[in-house]
């Protein structure tokens, strides 16, 4: 039998991260535990729906004599500025409308026009946020909730520096 090497995984996707994860949160925790880990951060895309599974399974492990710490977090969809993103989107949308109005005067490359708007809509980066303490967990809950509001959401829940700075206490980014 090989010697286990202690580790803590700080970025794992469960099956709750559609098209990017596999298994239930409990499966990830069990795998980590059986391979030398005593903690694991579940960081699903844009939400924390696996948190209840983490809490319940950690209690089950503790009752069985295993000391395993779930680390609560999220892989956020992050942009430097949501205001700039909205402006770019509106500008691209208006340019597309202008081209559509002027279609009788010129021939539009429809695919290129759609691609320009689509690229702006899909623009995002990934940022791992981990809760350092209860305050951090509460702040991540607020960040995730804010990212799903209409102004921040188009296919993906987004957050930016302004939002992150409002709710940064106890959050490791």
What spans do the regions from the language model cover?
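Phosphodiester-processing cores and adjacent nucleic acid-binding clamps
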Residues: 1-173
